[in-house]
Amino acid sequence: MLSDAERRLVAAIDADELVRLTQDLVRIDSVIRPETGNTEREAVRYIAAWIRRELGVAPVVEEAAPGRENVIATVDSGRPGPCLMLEGHTDVVSEGARERWTRDPFGAEIVEGKLYGRGSCDMKAGVAVALLTARALATSGVPWRGKIRLGLVCDEEGMMIGIKDFIRRGHADDVDACLVPEPEENQLCLSMKGAIRAKLIVTGRMAHGAMPLTGVNPNTRLARIVLAFERFEAAEKQRCGADEFLGLPSITFTVIQSPPPGSPAQLNVMPGEALAYVDIRTVAKQDHETVRAALRGILAELGAVDPDFKASLEFIEDRPVVAIGKDEPIVKASASAFADVTGRPPVYNGVPGATDGTFLSAWKGIPCLVNGPGPRHLPHQADEYVEVTELVEAARVYVVAAHRFLASSVSRRRD
């Protein structure tokens, strides 16, 4: 049951304002476009100005890389207590072919209760939830304890340089728990899949298309690697089974280019090299070093039977599987808040990919709960949307969860 103070906090979440804020953010094109130099910068400027105006604190804007900025702010209650981080990202993926959209991808149009646009659920809606949660605590007049740390970072959709820079600069050192409002239909996601990213280069020997025997075709060798990796994937699925929340592991070839960028392709030329990127998603029963060793072993086996087989495998990113238990204070606070705000029992789940919370958990040991508005399987698709009712529900749950966590928890990192 909500207390009188919590009812005041819920009332401080203005639904119309929340929707307008989300629309404003969606209308800012924060797709990373190297050809034009477009980045998250305009979104960062908007958010920083909002924080100054609405929270009365000075945000910190820092470059994680040239033109790629994080915006950070701390709202302090003035009373001793934990530090709760509200984390989000300002970058969005490309809208792709606009003819596949039935709405303007940056129009933030609302039709039949759905707010459409690129990044509407992933995750401009979540950023708006974080901002209004912080403001409700700061301005409602309801007493609270501890601090809120807003960390709204760049490049989550890339190599996550934003959250890595945030951590390296010490902004997570005093954080006791983190809420990540990624699109999860307001389900409480206790775990996140791991990820291993790999780059494959297969080297052959160029030849005329009419005389392929005078060369070595890298594409046929790459095809053997694809099939061998698929067999390993099938064996791992059989061995691990389906994780309760994360499902099955996977190995996906996401990019194949032959010849690689910079070498013009010609119909009558057998290329001398092929490039591939592989996205490997892992579950709790898998050890990353064992997976890496197995993939290296596959290449060694293929090379042992083909003297012309030459392939290099470089692992360019490693994101471990992370998980927290239902007994974590931030989970308890969020579960009870969800039940009391909505009248429904919480649904527990896992994130099918990684989030910025992966590194907060893996590098700093911070309990991270991922739960935010938006369809779980819609991000990165055309006609992306967030349900307005789900958006408002998320903000109301968040403000109660934050208040309960800060009131009942003792900082594990400082006091």
Language-model segments: which ranges?
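Short beta-strand segments
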Residues: 87-88, 151-153, 179-182, 201-203, ...
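N-terminal helical capping/dimerization or prosegment-like subdomains
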Residues: 1-96, 273-277, 292-294, 390
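Metal-dependent amide/peptide-bond hydrolase catalytic core
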Residues: 1-6, 190, 197-415
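Acidic/histidine-rich catalytic neighborhood of metal-dependent amide-processing enzymes
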Residues: 123-194, 237, 406, 413
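A structural signal for isolated positions on well-ordered beta-strands in alpha/beta enzyme cores
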Residues: 60, 85, 149-151, 312
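Active-site metal-coordination/substrate-binding segment of hydrolases
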Residues: 81-149, 382, 388
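Acidic-glycine-rich active-site phosphate/pyrophosphate-binding loop
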Residues: 95-111, 175, 190-202, 336, ...
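Short helix-capping segments at alpha-helix termini
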Residues: 54-55, 140-144, 171-172, 302-308, ...
